[in-house]
UniProtKB/Swiss-Prot annotation:
Activity control note: Inhibited by UTP.
GO cellular component assignments: cytosol
Native organism taxonomy: Bacteria, Pseudomonadati, Pseudomonadota, Gammaproteobacteria, Oceanospirillales
HAMAP family: PyrH_B
Chief location of this protein within or outside the cell: cytoplasm
Keyword Cytoplasm recorded: yes
Subunit structure: Homohexamer.
Keyword terms: ATP-binding, Cytoplasm, Kinase, Nucleotide-binding, Pyrimidine biosynthesis, Transferase
Compartmental location: Cytoplasm
Binding site for UMP: G68, D88, T149, G150, N151, P152, F153, F154, T155, T156
Pathway: Pyrimidine metabolism; CTP biosynthesis via de novo pathway; UDP from UMP (UMPK route): step 1/1
Organism encoding this protein: Chromohalobacter salexigens (strain ATCC BAA-138 / DSM 3043 / CIP 106854 / NCIMB 13768 / 1H11)
Entry binding sites for ATP: K26, L27, S28, G29, G69, R73, T176, Y182, D185
Protein name per its UniProtKB record: Uridylate kinase
Amino acid sequence: MSAPTDRSATPAERNEKSKYKRILLKLSGEALIGEHEFGIDPKVLDRMALEIGQLVGIGVQVGIVIGGGNLFRGAALHAAGMERVTGDHMGMLATVMNGLAMRDALERSNIRSRVMSAIPMSGVVEHYDRRTAIRYLTSGDVVIFSAGTGNPFFTTDSAACLRGIEIDANVVLKATKVDGVYDKDPVKHADAAKYERLTYDDVLDQKLGVMDLTAICLVRDHDMPVRVFDMTKPGALLNLVVGGKEGTLVDRG
C-alpha cells in the first residue's frame, strides 16, 4: 500500500503521486437516498458530483456504476411471487434512472459525463460499447455504466467489477456507509475490528460479505484490487485516490 498522503500539499501538487489514473466507482442506490426513506436526495447528488469533479480536476479518469435499491427492491416482490427475471429487469431500469440523475448533477457542475446502458435504450442513453467508453474516459468524460451487466441474476457489484476489468481500471472503489470491512457488523458490535487489508481468499473463506461471490471471484481471477471506503466522509474519495489510507484494501496480498 502507498504511504500516507502529504496533507500539506494541494491535490494538484499530489497528482504526480496519485495511486490511480483510472477508477471504477461503485455507488449503492441506497447512498442516494440521503435523509429520505426512498428516492433520490438532490443534496447527496450534488455532494457526490463535487467530489467526483475533484478527481476529474486532477486528471483521474472516472467510471461509475450505481445500484438501484433506492428506487426498486426486487427481493420483496420476488418473495411475493414475481418472477426473478422480471424483477431484475425492473432493477436494471432503476439504475438507468439513477444514472440520468447523476449525469444531470455532474453536468450542472460543468463536468462532462455520459450514461451508457447495457440494454439498448435509443433516444435516452447510449448503448454500452467498451471501446467507446474508453475513448470517453481518455478524453476526460465521466462515464456512468447503467443497467448492470444487461443480464438477470447478476448484481450491480458484479457489474462494477466487470466494467472495471473491461475498461482497464486500476481499482474498483466500493463506496459504503462504513469506513472499511469489519470482522462483524460495527453498528451492532462495539468491539468489531476493522481490516486494513485482506486477500480475495480471506473474503471468501471468512464470508465477510464485501461483495457477492460472483464479484469476488471475478476480481480475484483478473487481479483487480477493490477498496471499500466510507463515501459519507467528506474528502475520503479524493484522499484515497491520491494515495491516502482510507477503508480496506482487498487484493491478491
